[in-house]
Amino acid sequence: MVNNMTDLTAQDAAWSTRDHLDDPVIGELRNRFGPDAFTVQATRTGIPVVWVKREQLLEVGDFLKKLPKPYVMLFDLHGMDERLRTHRDGLPAADFSVFYHLISIERNRDIMLKVALSENDLRVPTFTKLFPNANWYERETWEMFGIDIEGHPHLTRIMMPQTWEGHPLRKDYPARATEFDPFELTKAKQDLEMEVLTFKPEDWGMKRGTDNEDFMFLNLGPNHPSAHGAFRIILQLDGEEIVDCVPDIGYHHRGAEKMGERQSWHSYIPYTDRIEYLGGCVNEMPYVLAVEKLAGITVPDRVNVIRVMLSELFRINSHLLYISTFIQDVGAMTPVFFAFTDRQKIYDLVEAITGFRMHPAWFRIGGVAHDLPRGWDRLLREFLEWMPKRLDSYEKAALRNTILKGRSQGVAAYGAKEALEWGTTGAGLRATGIDFDVRKWRPYSGYENFDFEVPVGGGVSDCYTRVMLKVEELRQSLRILQQCLDNMPEGPFKADHPLTTPPPKERTLQHIETLITHFLQVSWGPVMPAQESFQMVEATKGINSYYLTSDGSTMSYRTRVRTPSFAHLQQIPSAIRGSLVSDLIVYLGSIDFVMSDVDR
């Protein structure tokens, strides 16, 4: 259980810039390492941000992990090219930096550690000795910035092809395809790429066999239907038993974070929909909230409730697809067709409200694109009358089936310790008995005003428990939607603020200054104050977050997107070793991921 304590962001105005020197962890660090050992940075992230010396990094991380109420999860780890950043007053000199975002479940508190690096000495020690899930994050940090990770067990490219040259998130790396030479796939290059994709067990510390027999190495994917996207897993098999495996990702990588550096704060919104392409408005929520923290915008109550309503509609939509395809992976075909009928009703409702279906790009900085249309309440009421009975039928016909239970109970099971070590969030974490839902413990967009429960498992997260928790989450989302229907506030659908983008249309027809602002914001883009902000949300597949750095420009200096699926796929080998190939298929179906969410 976590303490019922909201984070500092909820207690203060969303845009307040704070150093959080009053956070107990700052005192604990200073008592242990001295009052002058760190530089504490004031930000709008809502969490303490502490710059530590590279030589102290592992010691500080170990100290935080062993506190009485420890920081048990490495939530995120990545880097930043600081060379062109102009607003750095009071910060340590740095050409590059690496940040480590840790979470304490018992405290319901976070801390971010930062390490400053010079261009001629780009190296940090590996964090995998403390948190095993640092592995993939460090590989991506090296790949994107060229920062060497000393002691890393397998420092290779993870998102880009192994033949790729350069480090894409450096500021001197081109952001547009037109800045590259035209791509030509010659026969020699094609042969080289195929050769690079050939799996060599020795590169991963695997043996090709024992003294008596050879292991089989099997490619599952990257276009296998049970891989749920362009995803490849190389399996080391002894018969049908999985001895070990290597997940291979990156086939869906689109450079979403690099795009954030060349799109305006406003024009980046459509890209957020496509990070996790089933989540729709759920993906827009953390980005828009993070930008509003930078801008200092507090939105009207009506906007909060509308955003919650759209988010919960997309949560139900995503969960229905997840549950039905899981049932299909186990072997039952009918439910997936019924689920698409239900999802069609949601899309009709979403389209009536936003004008679009899967990717509405409907949230705005300071509000939403337009007000709710006439008749939205009737459509929502009809859906709320329809859906509960359908859920009952899914549960009775398929999810309580003894064959499905036999295939999924006890499969790919792990406990709370393993979940925290691998950065698992969402239903996978809650199935272990840890009651941690961001909507409850760190409420945003007015979730604290809604009455709903957080489904929690009994201590072990297996395939069946994860699915059944999602079913109950569906019921809770229906409760939230009913409250949106019954208690939709009156009022404007945009905040009265200079950085609301676009500004309210009626004012542009009366005030020349507002018309000029409208023109500049939709063409050039709004200028956000130079600061850092952070927002996490309970997305459809776990915790999704945006960590934004503004240098006082119309575009983000650094857009860091942390997605739950990236962490969940890294956990696969530890959860599936010793199981059968057929168990892996069930496990993959129970994770709830799409590759766009993994690869960004």
Swiss-Prot record:
**Enzyme Commission number(s):** 7.1.1.-
Source domain of life is Bacteria
Q: How does it sit in the membrane?
A: Peripheral membrane protein
Q: Which UniProt keywords apply?
A: Cell inner membrane, Cell membrane, Membrane, Multifunctional enzyme, NAD, Quinone, Translocase, Transport, Ubiquinone
Location in or out of the cell: Cell inner membrane
InterPro entries associated with the record: NADH_DH_suC, NADH_DH_suCD, NADH_Q_OxRdtase_suD, NADH_quin_OxRdtase_su_C/D-like, NADH_UbQ_OxRdtase_30kDa_su, NADH_UbQ_OxRdtase_49kDa_CS, NDH1_su_D/H, NiFe-Hase_large
* Gene Ontology cellular component annotations, sorted alphabetically: NADH dehydrogenase complex; plasma membrane
Q: Name one GO molecular function term.
A: NADH dehydrogenase (ubiquinone) activity
Q: What class of enzyme is it?
A: translocase
Q: Where is this region: NADH dehydrogenase I subunit C?
A: 1-190
Any one Pfam family here would be: Complex1_49kDa
Start and end residues of each stretch annotated as NADH dehydrogenase I subunit D: 214-600
- Extract the signal peptide range: none
Keyword Transferase in record? no
Return the similarity comment.
Answer: In the N-terminal section; belongs to the complex I 30 kDa subunit family. In the C-terminal section; belongs to the complex I 49 kDa subunit family.
This protein's assembly is summarised as:
NDH-1 is composed of 13 different subunits. Subunits NuoB, CD, E, F, and G constitute the peripheral sector of the complex.
What does the protein in this record do?
NDH-1 shuttles electrons from NADH, via FMN and iron-sulfur (Fe-S) centers, to quinones in the respiratory chain. The immediate electron acceptor for the enzyme in this species is believed to be ubiquinone. Couples the redox reaction to proton translocation (for every two electrons transferred, four hydrogen ions are translocated across the cytoplasmic membrane), and thus conserves the redox energy in a proton gradient.
**Protein's recorded name:** NADH-quinone oxidoreductase subunit C/D
> In which organism is this protein found?
Salmonella newport (strain SL254)
**High-level lineage:** Bacteria, Pseudomonadati, Pseudomonadota, Gammaproteobacteria, Enterobacterales
